UniProtKB/Swiss-Prot annotation:
InterPro entries: ScpB_csome_segregation, WH-like_DNA-bd_sf, WH_DNA-bd_sf. One of its GO terms (cellular component) is cytoplasm. The lineage of its organism: Bacteria, Bacillati, Bacillota, Bacilli, Lactobacillales. Its main location: cytoplasm. It is found in: Cytoplasm. Belongs to the ScpB family. This is Segregation and condensation protein B.
């Protein structure tokens, strides 16, 4: 079984920018808060001692999160200024689609739909101005809600979200396309068989 430290790091990684409270981490890890505090101190010491990691532990308003070290601020600022004309990754496009159709939505809800962590894609989409924080969800931990921006509408060439293709329509078109792609005979001779 994984160490408490590895399990703690995994939870904080998946929590992303929302972070986790001491109480939530203690419940999930099934350890007392005193033991958790010691583990957090060990994790912070590990990050500080390792010059080959860009990560550090940040505590803010009784919430802990894994973030990049301040030394990398200039590099990340330059990255965030990268022009939007470069193509978005498949992951970013998936996240953008989910946010567009399900907004407002939390990162955890996006993760549930995709089955993987979406923190990086969300950060990139925010940096490009395609999505924004749209408040906090009234739930445990008060996670951020995300929604698309006016720039998103301009970027995809529509005037309002009402102009998005209905999901049912997309599913129907996808099924029709897959019928012709996957189930189509390799050549016309197969039609006779």
């Amino acid at each position: 079984m994984s160490s408490h430290l590895a399990r703690l790091e995994a939870l904080l990684f998946v929590a992303g920018e929302d972070g986790l409270s001491l109480r939530t981490m203690a419940q999930l890890l099934e350890i007392p808060v005193t033991g958790l505090t010691q583990s957090l101190e060990k994790l912070q010491a590990k990050y500080e001692a390792d010059e080959d990691t860009a990560l550090c532990l940040l505590e803010s308003s009784n919430t802990y999160k894994i973030v990049t070290k301040p030394d990398f601020a200039c590099l990340l600022r330059d990255y965030s200024k990268t022009p939007i004309n470069q193509s978005l990754s498949r992951a970013s496009l998936e996240v953008l689609s989910i946010v567009a159709y399900k907004q407002p939505i939390t990162r955890a809800e996006v993760d549930d739909i995709r089955g993987v962590n979406s923190s990086g894609a969300i950060a990139k989409l925010q940096a490009f101005g395609l999505i924004r924080e749209a408040g906090k969800k009234d739930a445990v931990g008060r996670p951020n809600l995300y929604a698309t921006t006016d720039y998103f509408l301009d970027y995809i060439g529509i005037n309002s979200l009402d102009e998005l293709v209905a999901i049912d329509q997309l599913e129907l078109e996808e099924q029709e396309t897959s019928l012709f792609r996957e189930d189509a005979p390799e050549d016309l001779e197969d039609l006779d068989n």
